[in-house]
Structures are given as structure tokens and as C-alpha cells.
């Protein structure tokens, strides 16, 4: 691929980003991506593709993209290529909205191995994994020079922080996504199989899961963990230097940088000698079943998007975090934050791309909240969640 230009004219941007057409057009590529991603960088890649092939590429970021795609693709309209977190791809595939993709082994080997698991649905690949999103333990280096290796160290850290008038840790505890690394240590969400997941085999009510939630309840009773704190308050308190640690993802780094905080990103501590298992989300590219441009979409994705130059352009627009393309990821790992994110991703659990995850989020979150607020016992809360998910 030729060297990418670094800017587009205002007119070109307006054409690429605000065009209202939702219908697929033969001989042109329409791409949808969320507005918080590097859509301007992606448009640069599209411009290069157009220069080389004569095929026009339109990049759009419609509101409520993930639900709108389901609506319009079902009627034969919408984009040729959609970018979204992989966990939504399972429901798209079940509805017949995504094409199976068949990249060569040579191409597959260019990407980090475990990332392909994210787009494996019933033994078929339904997209191309692009960027890896995993939460991490973020710590204030001025308050805590070294992060803990085990969660069992929290009471000792609490004693030190209390003497300084600071809090030990804050995060959005009631949100199962952020709390899963702790409560899942040594357990799992859905049983992994060769073809995907066994939705009838879930681990949220395993013996390990009950022990982990008991630990979290103990930390709450000791005043170390506060289940009443929401995401915004936790993020603000940490950015202001009032808390030693938080649990958050790469999207939070920008605000911490702006705040001038001296922070580090670490691998999660172990609990009961078991590694923490954060859920791993993969920004992925899927090809719509309604697209008449399958060959063009594959050409764009495999030979233009998945190159060091293209990913650098997108990353310069808005950071991708860790990426699946091995060559570009190696160039990013001089950033210790990205290296730690990748470690947590490798230790973590790919978010299952199955419809049952929609119930999981509500049921597991409610179980955590009810236990920590004293409304249910651990046994009752997790049994209820398990029953709801298995319905």
C-alpha cells in the first residue's frame, strides 16, 4: 500500500462522514464505525483504496450504530462493512446479517492467535479482529509505587492509605464488566468449546465464584470496597489523586493524562492463587450479508486495513490500544500501558459472542449488588443469576 496522506479537505470530510445514504451500492464501499473510534484515520485508508482501485469508500458513524445495523441490514440495506465490539456479532450472525469470512492461514497468522476466537461463531469466522480492549488495574504511582500482586494485599494497603487520608480502591463495583476480574478468578462465564461456547454450562455459581464474591463482601465490610460508587465518581476521585487504585480501560487514559496524574497500568492481581479473568472485547470488522461488494470488502480489509501504515494512521487519529496485527503491536509495546493491557487480555476471557450475554450482564450485576448491599446471600444471589441466564 502506498504512503497514506495525513489529512483530507473539509469538503471531502463532509462527503465521507455526513452522507445520509444507508443503502448498499454495487461498486462502492460503505463503512460504519462508532464516533469514538478513529473514523478520520479510517477515511484516510479509504481514500488510498480509492486512489489505487477507483472504488469509492464512504465512512459514516450513525447514532445507535449497533441497533441500527440490525434494523437496516435485515431489510437488505446498511453498510458493506461494520466495525463494532465482537460480542454483538453473535446476535448479528444468528440473525443471518453477517457473511462468513475465509481468510487464508497466511493472513490468520499475521494476527494474534487468541483474537480469532472472538469472531468464531459456531465454528465459522464472522469477522476480522482488529483491536483488543481489556480493563486493567490502574494505580497512582505517587501513592502506591508498586501495584499489589495479590488482592489479599488490600487490607495492608488500606492501613497505609488511611494514614495518608486516601482511599485504597474505587471502581464501578455494581457493573459486572469491571468486577468480573475479581469474582471470576479460577472460574469462567460460559464453557469454551471447539465451536464456540456451551451456553448451558456457566460458571458464575461455581465454588470458586462463590468464594470470590465472599472475598469481595469481606472487603466491603472492612470499608475497603464501596459498592455505592459509580463509574463517574470513581474516575473523578482517582484522577484527583484521592484514591490509590481503580479498575478501568484504555479509554480512561486520556483524562488521566490531562489531569497530569502519575499513574501506571498493571496486570491484575491474583486471588486465591488464581489469575484474574477480565473480559476481553475485540473491535472487529464484519461484512454484511446484504453487501453486493464482498470481494471489494475483503480486499479493503485484508490488503489495506491490516497493514502497519493503515493502523498507524487510524491510531494517530484515535488510539486503538493493543492491536491484533503482530507487527504493529510490537511497535506499540514500548508503551508500558499497552503492554500491560495485552497481558491482561492474554490472561483474560474473550467476551462470548452469544445472545445469552445480554442476560448475563443484568443477572451477574444484580447478584453482585444484592450481595454487597445485604439483600441476598451469596448462594441465593448467584443461584438466581444462574437460573435467569439458563432460561
Regions found by a protein language model. Name each.
Residues 8-12, 22-89, 105, 272, ...:
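Conserved N-terminal structural module of periplasmic/extracytoplasmic solute-binding proteins
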Residues 45, 214-293:
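Extracytoplasmic/periplasmic substrate-binding proteins
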Residues 61-69, 87, 152-153, 226-240:
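Short helix-initiation/N-cap motifs at beta->coil->alpha
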Residues 86-136, 146, 151-158, 265-266, ...:
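Hinge/lid segment of periplasmic solute-binding proteins
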Residues 98, 251-254, 283-359:
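Mature extracytoplasmic/periplasmic domains
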Residues 126-130, 135, 155-201, 243:
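Extracytoplasmic/periplasmic solute-binding protein
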Residues 158, 198-228:
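Glycine-centered hinge/linker elements that transmit conformational signals in sensory
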Residues 344-391:
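Conserved C-terminal helix/tail region of periplasmic/extracytoplasmic solute-binding proteins
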